Regions:
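A structured beta-alpha segment of the ubiquitous adenosine-cofactor-binding alpha/beta core
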Residues: 44-99
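A structural alpha-helix within SAM-dependent methyltransferase catalytic domains
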Residues: 12-15, 97, 119, 160
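Internal alpha-helical scaffold of NAD(P)-dependent oxidoreductase catalytic cores
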Residues: 124, 145-171
């Protein structure tokens, strides 16, 4: 959720895994919405990190959606990259809960806010977890996983599994 600098980087991270498809929720569908992702992938191609074919495969696994319900209703793992404003994050998670599956994991990419506080307005707080990607998220392998007071063991383990599948090193 959020197609800014971190949201675009994380979309790329997850789409690099052939088993993962990404829906990037954005407020508007601009014609140039893929440009930041393409620019990063082009650099990776020029440095022989990925091939041109891999670039196209990654792009094919990323779709954009403006409707929050459509973006989240079938998701297994939802990560928000919203502005660092507590009420914004709390309200966003509370709204997402209205649409997403009961077993979907709700992750926050915050670097400074408590996942416990972010989960305060959620009904199913046990599925909220922190997943702090270091910037630039598509290059740095480390991801800090922060369990909220309510986070279930299963959600913590599944989050670590998803991050490993995306090629990251969760700690």
């Amino acid at each position: 959720i959020g197609a800014g600098m971190m949201g675009n980087a994380l979309a790329m991270v997850f789409a690099m895994s052939p088993d993962l498809n990404v829906t990037l929720r954005t407020r508007t569908l601009k014609d140039d919405r893929y440009d930041p992702i393409i620019a990063h992938l082009d650099i990776m191609v020029s440095r022989d990190v990925i091939t041109g074919v891999q670039k196209e495969e990654v792009l094919s696994r990323i779709t954009f959606e403006t409707d929050l319900k459509k973006a989240t209703e079938n998701a297994d793992f939802i990560i928000e990259c919203a502005p660092e404003v507590m009420e914004t994050k709390q309200d966003l998670f509370a709204e997402i809960e209205n649409y997403c599956r009961k077993d979907a994991i709700l992750a926050t990419n915050t670097s400074v806010m408590s996942p416990t506080e972010i989960a305060a307005k959620c009904v199913n707080r046990e599925r909220v977890v922190g997943a702090h990607f270091w910037n630039p998220g598509h290059l740095i392998p480390l991801v800090e996983v922060i369990k909220a007071d309510y986070t279930s063991e299963e959600v913590g383990e599944l989050t670590m599994d998803v991050l490993r599948k995306a090629g990251k090193k969760p700690v």
